[in-house]
């Protein structure tokens, strides 16, 4: 499929794509502005004047925005103007939370990435005229990269990852993807394997700079509050972190096995933290239907009472708090076939980690964390919960895993510096 056929297909499928996004937006809440002028590369009536020659960073959603934090912060500290684009409302909200001060002083602007129509991408680049574009992780769009080439905007894929399954799935885009990847001026890969697969798919060359996720600084205030909160509960805590579709039901069923521990003193408290806010109410309904006593973190009622089985983590931006509060973290996305969620943040907090069998989005990180003694891999949700209970009974083993987790994340830090070094001639 060449780029022309890709564009025709995109135009034909656009109504279905917009319907899917509308449904997602309706569940998630927030201001998605699916048909705002900016989504088509146009300046709206209230759009601010663009920054002069900004460094443009695209972070599609929540996870990518968090991962981009150390890079964006480093650019801001150098005094550079930054244009930060997103596709989802959760990503944009996280950007506002992380970089509110820079937005307030006019050094950073946020915008929607336009849909990948040729005219929209041309208008976007002509309006903002970035000195360079940095696409986070996997955001390769054929028409966007073609427009950047035509307008002389150098483009890099940073903290790039590309799994074996991504390589297989890329085949249907054919020539359009090969041309897009070949049009990247630089590919800064997380690992040699990621870079090699990107070259198989069409990129010309790559440099390994590592994952920016290892450089994300966890807020000390949240860590302190999390530790204090856990101490005040007087109970051991297991976090079910970043659970995805279908996993809440698995774990809620497994939590039933904790009934045998009701007589234990103190009884374990479960933190259930769905990955996406649109599923908070759904998880609450499942807990209610299962007959589990639960409270919602958003209710702000302080430490849950001893009768509470589960605290539903229905807040955004508090993952460091949850990890600091937990004695053990079971990281979701890896028990359903979804590739896993970020385990690096939990390890950075010094929390022992258990992952499931499906970690292809974090293949190297999961493998290395397990080898370092920072994490365990369980075959299913029930086993993961059983292992977490065993760890609660073995403080020396938990402490060893905690120390290994911190050492492992510290050993892999430095991707921000390496990324900046690789882009130095673009940044001026």
Curated annotation (Swiss-Prot):
<dbReference type="InterPro" id="IPR001296">
    <property type="entry name" value="Glyco_trans_1"/>
</dbReference>
<keyword id="KW-0448">Lipopolysaccharide biosynthesis</keyword>
<dbReference type="GO" id="GO:0009245">
    <property type="term" value="P:lipid A biosynthetic process"/>
</dbReference>
<keyword id="KW-0997">Cell inner membrane</keyword>
<dbReference type="Pfam" id="PF04413">
    <property type="entry name" value="Glycos_transf_N"/>
</dbReference>
<comment type="pathway">
    <text>Bacterial outer membrane biogenesis; LPS core biosynthesis.</text>
</comment>
<feature type="site" description="Transition state stabilizer">
    <location>
        <position position="137"/>
    </location>
</feature>
<dbReference type="InterPro" id="IPR038107">
    <property type="entry name" value="Glycos_transf_N_sf"/>
</dbReference>
<dbReference type="GO" id="GO:0043842">
    <property type="term" value="F:Kdo transferase activity"/>
</dbReference>
<keyword id="KW-1003">Cell membrane</keyword>
<feature type="active site" description="Proton acceptor">
    <location>
        <position position="64"/>
    </location>
</feature>
<dbReference type="InterPro" id="IPR007507">
    <property type="entry name" value="Glycos_transf_N"/>
</dbReference>
<dbReference type="GO" id="GO:0009244">
    <property type="term" value="P:lipopolysaccharide core region biosynthetic process"/>
</dbReference>
<dbReference type="Pfam" id="PF00534">
    <property type="entry name" value="Glycos_transf_1"/>
</dbReference>
<comment type="similarity">
    <text>Belongs to the glycosyltransferase group 1 family. Glycosyltransferase 30 subfamily.</text>
</comment>
<keyword id="KW-0808">Transferase</keyword>
<keyword id="KW-0472">Membrane</keyword>
<feature type="binding site">
    <location>
        <begin position="274"/>
        <end position="275"/>
    </location>
    <ligand>
        <name>CMP</name>
    </ligand>
</feature>
<feature type="site" description="Transition state stabilizer">
    <location>
        <position position="213"/>
    </location>
</feature>
<feature type="binding site">
    <location>
        <begin position="342"/>
        <end position="345"/>
    </location>
    <ligand>
        <name>CMP</name>
    </ligand>
</feature>
<comment type="function">
    <text>Involved in lipopolysaccharide (LPS) biosynthesis. Catalyzes the transfer of a single 3-deoxy-D-manno-octulosonate (Kdo) residue from CMP-Kdo to lipid IV(A), the tetraacyldisaccharide-1,4'-bisphosphate precursor of lipid A.</text>
</comment>
<dbReference type="InterPro" id="IPR039901">
    <property type="entry name" value="Kdotransferase"/>
</dbReference>
<dbReference type="GO" id="GO:0005886">
    <property type="term" value="C:plasma membrane"/>
</dbReference>
<protein>
    <recommendedName>
        <fullName>3-deoxy-D-manno-octulosonic acid transferase</fullName>
        <ecNumber>2.4.99.12</ecNumber>
    </recommendedName>
</protein>
<feature type="binding site">
    <location>
        <begin position="316"/>
        <end position="318"/>
    </location>
    <ligand>
        <name>CMP</name>
    </ligand>
</feature>
